[in-house]
Amino acid sequence: MQRLRGFTLVEIVLAVFILLLLLGLAVPSLTGVLADKQLKRSLDGFNNLVRRAQERSVAERRPYLIVWSKKKVVARPEVFAEDEEIKATAEFALDRGEVLKLSLPAALTNKHPAEWIFWPSGTCEPAIVQFDGRSGSWAANYAPLTARAQVTNYAPR
């Protein structure tokens, strides 16, 4: 009896089982990488909004506000000129299930409007911003002199 070269059924089943095991281990780490990427995108998007508000307040020599609403956060001048169209200059949209919370530690009252001001000198009110969404959560302290973020909490899901 001559033996044919090839794989037996047991060897094929064993190879498929090992492949499925490796795939099962890779999928959770892949979802973690995707969640981290999405969380980083939200942090970068908000930091871009902050940078644009600061740059415009200095360039136009007038205060700018970052204003919170339910589904978005916008940057706009504090006061519009008479001939100026009333619209936001930059926007950070929030997806369903995402929450962006503003805390102003130097505010005179506990209940303050959800507005963060940038003055024409380039300084801003010190702020703590917290984000929570499906991809994870982050928190950042923004320095009053530079308006740059120091990330204090970053946890992808």
Residues covered by each model-derived region:
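N-terminal single-pass transmembrane signal-anchor helix
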Residues: 1-30
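N-terminal helix-rich module
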Residues: 2, 25-48, 55, 59, ...
